[in-house]
Amino acid sequence: MRGWKRIIGGALLVGLALLGQGRLSPAAADPCTALIGLVFGAAEVKSARAIAPPFRIASPYREETTEVDAPFCRVIGVIRPEAGSEITFEVWLPPAAQWNGRYEGVGNGGFAGSLVYRAMAEGMAAGYATSATDTGHGGAFDDARWAIGHPERVRDFGERAIHLTALAARAVIAVYYGRPAAWSYFSGCSDGGREALMEAERYPEDYDGIIAGAPAAPWVALTTGAVAGALALAAPGAALTLEKLDAIAAAAAAACAGGAEVIADPEACRFDPAALACTVRSAPGCLSPADLAALRFFYGGLTDREGHTLLPGFTPGSEREWRVWIVPVRPGELSFQRRLGTAFFADFIAEDPLWTPQGFDPPAAYAAAEAKYGAVLDATDPDLSRFAARGGRLILYHGWYDPAIPARATLDYFHAVQKAAGGPERAAAFVRLFMVPGMAHCGHGPGANAFGGVFGLPAPRRDAEHDVLAALDAWVREGRAPERLVATKYRNDDPAQGVAGETVLTPHP
């Protein structure tokens, strides 16, 4: 045996790495580079380097650059569970003196393809060893061509990569520090929220606590709805401009927020956009019949032929947040939803990069996609009994003004979890949901929206009242269930400009 060999039984990491023959020794001068060549199952460490600050790394996500101002060990590895699979993962390890003894895995967004370095750095700054994965491909967040002819890569993206990365990261942590992490958490938003629920539903032994923000859990319904919505906007006479979105949002707030900018209780809002319909004397910016038809779809959601809801609709008042996601900002551009939905049906389902939505029949398309990949991609199983039985804790959150994933989809899932658990009281022992007024997709929006989380703005304080990861940690380690979470509103959503206000969030309902 060359190097150190790691054996993982199920989801449990047992023992310490065995010292084998070759270049590694107990007296290795650099414990970071000594990790190179570590093998455990289908995973192997390819690179391990001690990083001295300042360290800067670019990420395709939101075209941001992450800066790390503390030393750490950067580990890069590859997992090949079957032919055609190549899952890249990274583990960032703070010095032993700064390690809090815990581990945080972080999720992705869109179709993944790269790592969210900012989330890894934020976790490490709080003392965690952190990990992330590209989920088995290097494509852009809206590019799914890697799926054509490769069902094994779809399996990696859907559920396998995030699970195997958890096992690999825990092995690396145990070898590097000489002891395993005492507690393991996962945090994700958007597709990362879907990944989080995959872990809770299918691999409950991987993590002690999980944060699932705005989860893209009903993946097939979301992508079907994205294409259907794009077609509604492309109908003759439809022209939902940015100016119209502003007018609709203002009218919704006037009807349901009493003059405030944010609708505090969208479930109680009864807003009819027909009040803005064009008449003979209407001002420019009024809504055409085709505009109103598109709005009815976006508010009402996706249904099957019998009228059963496949995906609930978006929240009145959120319309300003639809720009880019639902309505493109510039002529000739495609919205994020259209790009993601088209990529899914072209590359996952039709496996034809020239596919177009011409003749798209949403109920039929949904049924076909669900039959092919629903079991691999959807994280909608409400039975979390195995996760609860081993003491797992789950925090869900979702912004009411989310323009990418309808907030009511998470509400529906939460209610299903409550029912499966035997009622709200039993469910409250292991799962809490925080609905965030005025928050858009994973953050931002006009409401108070900063409490940490992947893609979110950092909390002003890393305590259990202001930071969602700290809240989860207190619940898991100390048994202090989160009864409130303070969301902060920074001026212009910029922490450097100071705090403009706060909103106290309480568990739903």
Regions found by a protein language model. Name each.
Residues L396-H398:
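Short beta-strand/loop motif that positions the catalytic acidic residue
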Residues G10-G20:
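Bacterial N-terminal signal peptides
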Residues N100, G109-G178, T224-G225, T356-Y366, ...:
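Cap/lid segment of the alpha/beta-hydrolase catalytic domain
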Residues L24-R102, Y117-R118, E261-I263, E267, ...:
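Catalytic-loop region of hydrolases
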Residues G188-G192, A196:
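Gly/Ala-rich beta-loop-alpha elbow adjacent to hydrolase catalytic centers
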Residues R179-C189:
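Alpha/beta-hydrolase fold nucleophile elbow
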Residues M198-A200, E205-T303, M435, N449-H466:
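A catalytic-pocket lid/entrance helix-loop region that shapes and gates access to the active site
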Residues A404-R408:
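Conserved alpha/beta-hydrolase "acid-adjacent" motif
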